[in-house]
């Protein structure tokens, strides 16, 4: 049957896509409402989409499903995730959780409830709500929140912590990340033996 006045077929729902509602990706057309990650169903756009053959994914799910696997292949230095990848068909074995200590009081909750503020780890002074920035699970002053090595201003998206200090991702990777061939951290020349 001819397709009179219609558009291409949607790569997700296989219904006709008209020009006003069309998003093109990898040579295929999609409705704006059908342009979602095939694994986590997150809405996509041109900056967040990653295509694999006829499938579309967000960059995170694409990396988990088709990216390199193993130690040293993560989302960057200091990034941890609790996602097991089950929605991608990946298997995960979790080690048993250690027993929790039986404590009944939390001094930081007590302090916050009765007006005493928490202390900044860098300067030791009180941190009030108007100047509070969270990093490494602790409150910091905005002025006490630069990278400990390069002094670059940090945000929640580029901060990593180690031993109570804050670092930008670049300094963290250079100083605490994996080293050797393939990691960009080769510190000495390898001699060729004949």
Swiss-Prot record:
Q: Which residues carry this modification: Phosphoserine?
A: 95, 111, 153
Molecular function via GO:
actin binding; actinin binding; identical protein binding; metal ion binding; MRF binding; RNA polymerase II-specific DNA-binding transcription factor binding; structural constituent of muscle; telethonin binding
Record PTM: Phosphorylated by PKC/PRKCA.
What GO cellular component entries does it have?
cytoplasm; cytoskeleton; nucleus; Z disc
Short name of one Pfam family: LIM
Q: Could you tell me which SUPFAM superfamilies the record lists for this protein?
A: Glucocorticoid receptor-like (DNA-binding domain) (SSF57716)
InterPro entries noted in UniProt = Znf_LIM
Query: Which stretches of sequence are listed as region Interaction with TCAP?
Result: 1-5
Record domain LIM zinc-binding: where? 10-61, 120-171
Q: Where is this region: Interaction with CLF2?
A: 94-105
Sequence motif Nuclear localization signal, location on chain: 64-69
Q: Does the keyword Cell division apply?
A: no
Which keywords label this protein? Actin-binding, Cytoplasm, Cytoskeleton, Developmental protein, Differentiation, LIM domain, Metal-binding, Myogenesis, Nucleus, Phosphoprotein, Repeat, Transcription, Transcription regulation, Zinc
The keyword Cell membrane is assigned to this record: no
Tissue and organ distribution: High in striated muscle and adult heart.
- What is this protein's function? Positive regulator of myogenesis. Acts as a cofactor for myogenic bHLH transcription factors such as MYOD1, and probably MYOG and MYF6. Enhances the DNA-binding activity of the MYOD1:TCF3 isoform E47 complex and may promote formation of a functional MYOD1:TCF3 isoform E47:MEF2A complex involved in myogenesis. Plays a crucial and specific role in the organization of cytosolic structures in cardiomyocytes. Could play a role in mechanical stretch sensing. May be a scaffold protein that promotes the assembly of interacting proteins at Z-line structures.
The family database entries (PANTHER family) matched by this protein are listed as: CYSTEINE AND GLYCINE-RICH PROTEIN 3, RHO-GTPASE-ACTIVATING PROTEIN LRG1
Q: What is known of its domains?
A: LIM zinc-binding domain 1 is required for self-association. LIM zinc-binding domain 1 and LIM zinc-binding domain 2 both are required for optimal actin-bundling activity. LIM zinc-binding domain 1 mediates binding to MYOD1. LIM zinc-binding domain 2 mediates binding to SPTB.
Q: How does it assemble?
A: Self-associates. Oligomeric in the cytoplasm and monomeric in the nucleus. Homooligomers preferentially form along the actin cytoskeleton. Interacts with TCAP, ACTN2 and NRAP. Interacts with LDHD, SPTB, MYOD1, MYOG, MYF6. Interacts with GLRX3 (via C-terminus); GLRX3 and calcineurin compete for interaction with CSRP3. Interacts with CFL2; the stoichiometry influences F-actin depolymerization and possibly two molecules of CFL2 can interact with one molecule of CSRP3 resulting in the highest functional impact; the interaction is stronger with phosphorylated CFL2.
Q: Quote the protein name from its UniProt record.
A: Cysteine and glycine-rich protein 3
Q: Organism source for this protein? A: Rattus norvegicus (Rat)
Q: What would be the name of the gene that encodes this protein?
A: Csrp3
């Amino acid at each position: 049957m001819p397709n009179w006045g219609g558009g291409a077929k949607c790569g997700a729902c296989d219904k006709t896509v008209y020009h006003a509602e069309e998003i093109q990706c990898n040579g295929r057309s999609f409705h704006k409402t059908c342009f979602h990650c095939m694994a986590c169903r997150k809405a996509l756009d041109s900056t967040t989409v990653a295509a694999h053959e006829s499938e579309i994914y967000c960059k995170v799910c694409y990396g988990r499903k088709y990216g390199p696997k193993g130690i040293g292949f993560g989302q960057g230095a200091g990034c941890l995730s609790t996602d097991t990848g089950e929605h991608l068909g990946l298997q995960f074995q979790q080690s048993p959780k250690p027993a929790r200590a039986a404590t009944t009081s939390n001094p930081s909750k007590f302090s916050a409830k009765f007006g005493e503020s928490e202390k900044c780890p860098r300067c030791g002074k009180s941190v009030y709500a108007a100047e509070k920035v969270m990093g490494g699970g602790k409150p910091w002053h905005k002025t006490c929140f630069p990278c400990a090595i390069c002094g670059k201003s940090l945000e929640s998206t580029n901060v990593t912590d180690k031993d109570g200090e804050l670092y930008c991702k670049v300094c963290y990777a250079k100083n605490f990340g994996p080293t050797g061939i393939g990691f960009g951290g080769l510190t000495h020349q390898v001699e060729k033996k004949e």
